[in-house]
Amino acid sequence: MQTHEIRERFTNHFVNAGHTAVPSASLILDDPNLLFVNAGMVPFKPYFLGQQTPPFANGTATSIQKCVRTLDIEEVGITTRHNTFFQMAGNFSFGQYFKEGAITHAWTLLTNPVEEGGYGLDPERLWVTVYLDDDEAAEIWEKKIGVPAERIQRLGMADNYWSMGVPGPCGPCSEIYYDRGPKYGNEGGPAVDDSRYLEIWNLVFMEFERGEGTGKDSFEIIGELPKKNIDTGMGVERVACILQGVENVYETDLLRPVIDVAETLTGATYGRDNTADIRFRVIADHSRTGMMLILDGVTPGNEGRGYILRRLLRRIIRSARLLGATGETMEKFMNTIMDTMTPSYPEIAENRERILRVAITEERAFLKTLVSGTHLFEEAAASIKSSGSTTVAGAQAFALHDTYGFPIDLTLEMAAEAGLEVDVEGFESLMAEQRSRAKADSQAKKHGHADLSIYREWVDNHPTVFTGFEELESQSRVLGLLSDGTRINEAAEGQEVEVILDQSPLYAESGGQLGDRGRILMGDTVVDIQDVQKIGKKLWVHKAVVANGGLAVGDEVVAAVDKQWRHAARQAHTATHLIHAALRQVLGPTAVQAGSMNKPGYLRFDFNYTDQLTPEQLNQIQAITNEAVDTDWAVNTIETSLEEARAMGAMALFGENYGDLVRVVEIGGPFSMELCGGTHVEHSSQIGPVALLGESSIGSGVRRIEAYSGLNSFNYLSKERALAESLSSILKTPSTDLPERISQLLDKLKAAEKEIATLHRRELAAKSEEFITGAEEINGIRAVMVRVQDGLDAGDLRTLATTLRDKLSNGEGLVVVASRSEDGTKVPFVAGATKQAVARGVHSGNLIKLIGSYIDGRGGGKPDMAQGSGSDIDGLDAAFNAVRAELENL
């Protein structure tokens, strides 16, 4: 039975029973807390919460809702159970029928013969679960429907009780499972093996109201609802698997055609290799989800829903390339999935061209960078491995993201495939820095206001006269005051204000140099200037706080620059010019400035260059810069025409738009000559020492040098010298020999760590018999639960757990071992169970989750082996007691 027919039969069944057919809502709802619709009942929430009256004639409705869940994108393809898009068929009753009606409707549709409009499932292969205390539902299933008692299983709140996770409606639920047969797992119903027994329908009986609480089973039931409601959800894809007789959703009529096309495009074959199969499934799943997101108006972007779509599309592209595709593939994938989905969603036809355009555009943009980005990553990975490291630096991950458009998720995926980890914290730090810069740039452009028209009168009629090249104090008049973007006539003490003056000696931020700090003075009035921004290259806006007294429009005042600020800012700006000149001497004329930022005592200089600078090159640049400082060259400024400046050899930077009259800053004749409107020292010696802090890559072909100047540089070098002297004293080694001495110590440390690890393993092996001898007998299960010595990692614990489990393999046995990291911040723990214990019902993964809840940790795994990590070692005894209680209850 084709999927579109499964959908039609569902809708017809409930419409014939008096339900109103409700079309699927968009995947995008006007809910800021919801990325995508992720459950069939989401569009009906206002009715269940009592916020709106259900508009349906009989108080009942049915829908087949398209849903997207993207929390586990990385799991897609690894197993056949994860899908990012699915269809949830549901029927809903608002105060009409309740348990018996919901159960009867579901059973009838599932088991009625195909010729009578049902799905024709064998009743003998259907199992049901009910909530532990829901005798009513159990009785309906057994007495009314005729399901044998042995195929009705009772489960707890975690499995068979529903709520929205917040105070509001809740209630028990009953789930219907299909027995796929012995080749899929153990008999005994869904409580024993959910791999064999496939959940196909969940019936939620909303009859109570819950209170506060977290988790699935840690809240109080505070009363009954005035009306009892029904919310059910049947997985369309799961029913399709059964009715089409296939192993999983990837084999159904919805997704298998995409895999077939992928085989043709790549030359690979599905079903022969697990790694290749994962990529085939990624292509199939993500093609459908991506297409449906585009259908509902999502476009690729760098945030929110757009980022999810971009991530999905790029995973398709990369998976196809890894399978062997050499050209564009998106058009064929999208056309194929649209063909399979159009019978269920006819609106796809009228949006076909748009969907293709969005997907193909994204593919072409990404393909331009995928090859080079992948090559860059592979080079980095090879270098990392050859150095003995296992971590991709945050800066490398950031470069992939910032330069090649690789989302961090893709870098994480590539790293995992290469057996590497990623310094995510370092990446996030660089991202935060980038966002901070972008925000600062945006604020500088907007000058604090989205609407700059408020400055228009002053820009046109009263541009600021800048006197700061000639003097540090000016007699000025207050032309205007603004507060929160609104013009005011006067400002009181403590008020933040923007001040417009007729003339000002304070430099307004531009050309990479931050605005001056200073004061506005008038009698007892003191106004602290915290920043100066420029509007339209003509108007200086002084952002300030009235520290004492008051200020009014028309006041005659003194505007004064903070002399220390200006001096240190001039040092940094002139040092920037010297470093640029030194760079070009060392690296050649292609090392052209791409951006800069300088403030008192510090500068950041970006330049076009592809390779990482060597320590020798950095030393050369620093030496040439300080030689220029020591030479005490005059720093001259010349105002001339742009043509004349270029004829002189002055460098114009950034692709800026210059006026007819420009300012040239010349240092040491031909050594440095640039167009610049900033403030500078009179002689290069006034800069003081310049200390390079290092260099890094900030993008494709762009690198950055950071440096201190003046007093900051002196303080930095003093600290470096003190550090070297301290190390020399501690290691009893001359400072010139420190690198060799430290290298020797590191070699010894590595050897010692290796020896300690060997001793640890021997000690653990010796203790294993002691642990076995001390095993507890709990409900027939021999359990070893111990905290071993500090410093063991998860790998050590896993080895120990495996050894101990093997020693218990002749019966029902459980092992739980835990340690604590040397710094005391982490608590790794591992659990392992013998085959006999697993058959008894022991599940190591579940026990790991239980332990994690006591020690502020998390983890999981398989029934026979699982691991986790926490942080609170003090909770370990309570965690072990909880495990004992679980074993007692088996």
Swiss-Prot record:
Give the GO cellular component terms, alphabetically: cytosol
| Superkingdom of the source species | Bacteria
Reaction(s) catalysed (UniProt annotation): tRNA(Ala) + L-alanine + ATP = L-alanyl-tRNA(Ala) + AMP + diphosphate
Q: List cofactor names only.
A: Zn(2+)
What is the first-listed, main subcellular location in coarse terms? cytoplasm
Q: What positions does the entry give for Zn(2+) binding?
A: H573, H577, C676, H680
One Gene Ontology term from the biological process aspect of the record:
alanyl-tRNA aminoacylation
Q: Where in the cell is it found?
A: Cytoplasm
Kindly list the GO molecular function terms attached to this UniProt entry.
alanine-tRNA ligase activity; aminoacyl-tRNA deacylase activity; ATP binding; tRNA binding; zinc ion binding
EC code(s) of this entry = 6.1.1.7
Please give the InterPro entries that the UniProt record associates with this protein. aa-tRNA-synth_II/BPL/LPL, Ala-tRNA-lgiase_IIc, Ala-tRNA-ligase_IIc_anticod-bd, Ala-tRNA-synth_IIc_core, Ala-tRNA-synth_IIc_N, Ala-tRNA_ligase, Ala_tRNA_ligase_euk/bac, DHHA1_dom
Instruction: Cite the cofactor comment.
Output: Binds 1 zinc ion per subunit.
Q: What does this protein do?
A: Catalyzes the attachment of alanine to tRNA(Ala) in a two-step reaction: alanine is first activated by ATP to form Ala-AMP and then transferred to the acceptor end of tRNA(Ala). Also edits incorrectly charged Ser-tRNA(Ala) and Gly-tRNA(Ala) via its editing domain.
Know anything about its domains from the record?
A: Consists of three domains; the N-terminal catalytic domain, the editing domain and the C-terminal C-Ala domain. The editing domain removes incorrectly charged amino acids, while the C-Ala domain, along with tRNA(Ala), serves as a bridge to cooperatively bring together the editing and aminoacylation centers thus stimulating deacylation of misacylated tRNAs.
Family recorded in the similarity comment: Belongs to the class-II aminoacyl-tRNA synthetase family.
What name goes with this protein?
Answer: Alanine--tRNA ligase
Q: Which organism is it from?
A: Corynebacterium efficiens (strain DSM 44549 / YS-314 / AJ 12310 / JCM 11189 / NBRC 100395)
